[in-house]
């Protein structure tokens, strides 16, 4: 949880409902404690909380002496507790802080819903403001429709809560929302409180500690859990809100295929410094994501099939449904013959083995179960031969795996994903490896599938048992489920009334399959000749003479296939599909169809669209369901180590047809969207627009937002790993050492190789395990392609050769994959399938060098042409906020990032390249964190041109997207912030004097910061002694090691996350403010105070930076930091350093107050100030206990009881500070 969800500048918020929720949850926790730990221990906890509350209140009122006295008394009492008392006390305070955090998130959602005026960051408010300021509505519509924001979820180790606890927290938030209802009866309210009591008790009785380090697969499952838990519901709500605001202010609805928001992931793809992320893991995670996507879509399709029961449809949908039926007949007849022939052959063999006469059986076997002259089907012949043959034939007619449509059922537990993700060593196409843990191909979701034929009424479905379903499914009989049962309850010959008389359904089906007769007609389903379809389909009789219809069938057909168009192609690419035509504004098309419908007589309409007794949408969606089930089964095969069945690709999605035979799996979102779009426009054509704009539209929006993999996976690796791989190649080929070449030599050789067409790496080249892993990663990337993967990010980019090296390794891998596949699928280097390569600039020196690196890249002939041909003249660059801050301090890093963005914008514009900046921000201010709208709107002008990528890390993912209502607000805030930064970019520094002052501030702050952090010989020892940095390794909060490959114990090799995390624990939070006070004081000494105050008021970049520092300073507590030093630091010189740091903190606070003009910290934001003061009485006791536990643990490092107590205290402080790393 984080404070950044609260708007800076908010004057006042009524916190009474929040305080009521906190009291309710606190009282429930108290009731639980009385039962769990006893009245005596509970009273001791109450006493300690009361002491902490009094000390905090006195401190707020300015009575420092009395507050210090109470704090000292509190510390003495806490440090004398034994562990049997300290652990429940720490747990109680930690749970209270977590519960209050849940209440705060819920209060934010409640506040937005209750206000009469729209949230100033809402779509409605921002659109209205832009129109008022003179923005043309058409320009606004285009900007929103073409906007592309992507949030990339990462698994950086800052989420201390187990996923089990996160789920319970989400459940409590949902119950609080229900508790707010004013229409609850007294009994219902009591029941609601009882539900809350049960959840709180379950929290207390659940172990809050991870007992083993999470794997990358565990982290990936956590990311997928967020999608299922909240984003799946939040995205369509957000799209509806966005479309409604657009319609209100521009007169246009949001295009159906627009994707203003997408999600990416690093979970399972970020291998920078994490040896646990391998090529196998990456392949496994992508299969897991596609399994989850297919499963979620299956649930929606099941519900849609129940809802879309109407029998009116457009010509396009009717054509699609007929093709599905026809191919289902062919498939089913083949199954009948095969089963009957096998059974008859077995009967004849058995009879012969017993010496009996088998002439009739042999004859029947020779006939192969074909239809006989008197109309008896193969099933009838089988019955004459024996019961086994009859049963085999009957199975083929009665089997239907689609089942009865039914309303939405509760979501399956996300643990089903966990079952599928275990193990190592499974087969992957092309010889890659996934895992070996066996998994049934029939998951729990599939076991519950009902069984009714898609063309029948819900009430009259055909039922069968699950074993029969399994037998037919194992036989690959997917096509048999696509059509209604034509033969009634019997599989033999039967006559059914149709629109044109009677037909023997079994006979007609078998004859049609043989090609000897026209294919059968669906009972009671009129059709008409379609000159554009194959002869076999055109033979279907029609109920009336074909002729012109009052509807534009050609236009509707175009609408039904619009999903396959637009930028992005097969994988949905990154671009939106809202450019023009039917893929753009749907408003005109809807109005036109409604006008045509109202202008057509009911008789004409019925003749053209009604199909009595037939359910075309269920037929089409049934086929969609089969393909989704096949997709899910294929992923199960990959995840469990089985070789996937080699089904041919094609069907409805391929070519816009309506059949599909074996119902292959889905590869791209456009394939899945095509039949859904056809159904959508068919409903509008038939007067059912209000139906189309319900669940079906929500599903279409989800398809284009989540695709077939939910979140595309980025790959990330350090630049030196690529250089080492190429060094192994050049050394083996006798070309010298790549690592020893100059930058010019590297660029020259890389360009020459990329311009050529020959393979570079010999197949039999010996290599180390590290080099093999790098090459295997590129091979997996070549297999997975852009349908599954997003960008390839190069961390620690130093030169243009780092980017060119990745391009060469990508091309080499695709050539190898193409050769292994025998040339199938276009695996060559010219197929445009390479991932976009994204350099990441992190340190202060790298940020300064970014301009030269990108200039050299964009002026390289090969790279420039590659960028144009493959990536549409678009370049993405990532900026690192974490390492730059650790390297130079927050203020110097912020200014370097700002200038870097300005230069990158100028370079790309000069080269006619569209730039997307990818911001690698963390949760805390020390790592670039802060409120979303402030962060985006303080970027340099021109750096946000409708595209924006950003990471959300660790605890921030749950805080911003874990609850559906909060996620909805976040999505809207991202959208409007990017829109404002695009259409009303923030102003640059208005005077050159401001730049000069910023340069001075940056220089002084960097020098002050580095003199302490990097140049003081005492600092590293003080850091290790005064914080729990060393002990953080025992907290299993991430799969990645805390340090990079270099083993030396220095600040430079320490990851930015534990660096921030450790300082947050002792409440000094040094990385976020160190150096800033010295810089501001130096500027004010030179007479720049008025300039600083003007910069704060008028320059968004500087103002937001100062506001964030002020918020961090309000969270610091030098008294707590002094306690850590007093108890844990023994060296007098280190203690002097600690005293100097606290003195610098005080000076920084004074300097910030002078610049802002505030009387006290956060006096301009009383809401946030109040929230921080509400937490202090619970955080302070945990800090004091942590100090004592650290002291004891360092004397007895193997004491597991002390370790547990320390980890519980770390969790509790993280909950109270609302951010960790």
UniProtKB/Swiss-Prot annotation:
Q: What is the lineage of its organism?
A: Eukaryota, Viridiplantae, Chlorophyta, core chlorophytes, Chlorophyceae
A cellular component term from Gene Ontology for this protein is: cytoplasm
List, in alphabetical order, the Gene Ontology terms for molecular function in this entry: phosphoenolpyruvate carboxylase activity
Annotated EC: 4.1.1.31
Q: What class of enzyme is it?
A: lyase
Extent of Gly residues compositional bias: 565-575, 648-661
Q: Which Pfam families match?
A: PEPcase
Q: What is this protein called?
A: Phosphoenolpyruvate carboxylase 2
Q: Which cofactor does it need?
A: Mg(2+)
| Catalytic activity reported | oxaloacetate + phosphate = phosphoenolpyruvate + hydrogencarbonate
Superkingdom, according to UniProt? Eukaryota
What's its job? Answer: Through the carboxylation of phosphoenolpyruvate (PEP) it forms oxaloacetate, a four-carbon dicarboxylic acid source for the tricarboxylic acid cycle.
Q: What is its main location?
A: cytoplasm
Q: Which InterPro entries match?
A: PEP_COase, PEP_COase_bac/pln-type, PEP_COase_Lys_AS, PEPCASE_His_AS, Pyrv/PenolPyrv_kinase-like_dom
Cite the active-site annotation: 156, 886
The entry assigns this protein to a family as follows: Belongs to the PEPCase type 1 family.
**What is the species listed in this Swiss-Prot or TrEMBL entry?**
Chlamydomonas reinhardtii (Chlamydomonas smithii)
**Record's keyword terms, sorted:** Allosteric enzyme, Carbon dioxide fixation, Cytoplasm, Lyase, Magnesium, Pyruvate
GO terms under biological process: carbon fixation; tricarboxylic acid cycle
Q: Where are the annotated segments for Disordered?
A: 443-588, 642-661
Q: Where in the cell is it found?
A: Cytoplasm
Low complexity: bias regions: 503-513, 550-564
